[in-house]
UniProtKB/Swiss-Prot annotation:
EC number of the protein: 5.3.1.6
Catalysed conversion reaction: aldehydo-D-ribose 5-phosphate = D-ribulose 5-phosphate
Subunit field text: Homodimer.
Protein name: Ribose-5-phosphate isomerase A
Length: 224
């Protein structure tokens, strides 16, 4: 059986060339991209610098011998490759299923180019079936939860081992079960204005192409 995640991870690595500063994504699909970059560094002598989007990816990349720098140690990132939980026809998406949305977005906005790698199931007409992660500071989180309840957003705290999940940046995540997002831009602006919200999982206008894994092979879709 074809591993679609591995397929697109390896394909995305073809866009990486010597001298690049590369954003290394987080999650089960980006894992294979990082794995392939590590192989090329070891076997082909690929010369790149990686900038990671989570502590987990940093550990993985370091174990493969990929040279790493912090986002604050570089002026920009040439290319970031990451997974996504949903992608619509406008190349906007939802990310954060792996709880790394804040670091992922910091790296993405500092990148000259971003590619998302997904399987066919992640391509949707309208965002929202996947719960929208909202990263919030711990102080006042219950008040934010109640605010989202009043708005009808069906919130739930992200849990881990029976406790509220704490992100790499020491925040909580509230997942919003929106079912369907009618106006992505308006919701993003609303969340951006909400005090206590650190970041949200709506990624808008950040990517140039999506590599979609299919049984027939990877399909590269460019933004028009």
């Amino acid at each position: 059986m074809i591993n679609l995640k591995e397929q697109v991870g390896i394909k995305a690595a073809e866009f990486v060339t010597d001298g690049m500063i590369v954003g290394l994504g987080t999650g089960s699909t980006a894992y294979y991209f990082v794995q392939e970059i590590g192989r090329r560094v070891a076997e082909e002598g690929l010369q790149i610098t990686g900038v990671t989007t989570s502590h987990a990816t940093a550990e993985h990349a370091a174990s493969l011998g990929i040279p790493l720098k912090n986002i604050d140690e570089v002026e920009y990132v040439d290319l970031t490759v990451d997974g996504a939980d949903e992608v619509d026809g406008d190349f906007n998406g939802i990310k954060g299923g792996g709880a790394a949305l804040l670091m992922e977005k910091v790296v993405a906005v500092n990148s000259k180019d971003c590619i998302w790698i997904v399987d066919e199931s992640k391509m949707v007409q309208t965002l929202g079936a996947f719960k929208l992660p909202v990263e919030v500071v711990q102080y006042g989180a219950e008040n934010l939860f109640r605010l989202f309840e009043k708005k009808g957003y069906r919130p739930s705290f992200r849990m881990r081992n029976g406790k509220k999940h704490i992100t790499d940046m020491q925040n909580f995540i509230i997942d919003l079960d929106l079912r369907r997002i009618e106006d992505t831009y308006a919701l993003a602006e609303e969340l951006d204005r909400t005090v206590g919200v650190v970041e949200h999982g709506l990624f808008i206008g950040l990517i140039s192409k999506v590599i979609v894994g299919t049984p027939e092979g990877p399909n590269i879709i460019e933004k028009k």
